[in-house]
């Protein structure tokens, strides 16, 4: 259904004025009339009415509504502050960044180190600057771990020694050495050469052993080497060592050379019976 528009009629405003001294005419003759005579007569009151036509006024409902401008609401990002660790020389900005600064003890001023995304990054930069300004004894956010013995290095060295013993003397390099071993190539070649050789192919070949009796005869005579045609005894005119050499010498019983314990009673063969074992040959391995 279409809504019928109400037609507003013009408004009329009537103004009425009552004038008790109003007259019908304004002639000069009437001005000469005696007022005393008129006072006794009935006075005539004249009323004036004036109409004013007012234009129609548009109703408030028909007036066009002005569009209201929406005010822009500036939203400030809310930074959620959690229970984080507080670092030395690090503070958080209102917009969420982390700033780092340090005080220079020599110049007595604050040195700006920069702005970072996380507090840990700012703390690390502060630690580096503190070490440069105050030395290794500076208070740090992340102190270095205490120096401990390197147990892994010791265990590696022990393992290398055990491998050397088990491997039959193979030349192994130290795990901490930076120098090349001159025997590494040779040991590798020898190891590759003996790979695949079975123990069944190794035959022990024994050579005849030499006894002490083989050395009983002299290899060379004195005459052949030095060319002596005569013996030493003939050169000096007789026996050099005769039977009576020790005849004039008398030994007491304290030396054990008496009648019962002379040179004849010594068992010389007992002292040299094992001489053949010294010259025995080791078995030779043949492949």
Swiss-Prot record:
Organism's domain of life?
Eukaryota
Localisation per UniProt entry? Cytoplasm; Nucleus
What does UniProt give as GO cellular component? cytoplasm; nucleus
- Keyword Methyltransferase in annotation: no
- Which keywords are on file for this protein? Activator, Cytokinin signaling pathway, Cytoplasm, DNA-binding, Ethylene signaling pathway, Nucleus, Transcription, Transcription regulation
Q: Name one GO molecular function term.
A: transcription cis-regulatory region binding
Task: Give yes or no: UniProt keyword DNA-binding.
Answer: yes
S-S pairs:
none
Q: What is the first-listed, main subcellular location in coarse terms? A: cytoplasm
Q: Name one GO biological process term.
A: ethylene-activated signaling pathway
Q: Which residues bind DNA?
A: 86-143
Positions of transmembrane segments: none
- State the family named in the UniProt similarity comment for this chain: Belongs to the AP2/ERF transcription factor family. ERF subfamily.
This molecule's function is given as: Component of the cytokinin signaling pathway involved in cotyledons, leaves, and embryos development. Probably acts as a transcriptional activator. Binds to the GCC-box pathogenesis-related promoter element. May be involved in the regulation of gene expression by stress factors and by components of stress signal transduction pathways.
Q: What is this protein called?
A: Ethylene-responsive transcription factor CRF1
Per the UniProt record, the source organism is Arabidopsis thaliana (Mouse-ear cress)
Q: Which gene encodes it?
A: CRF1
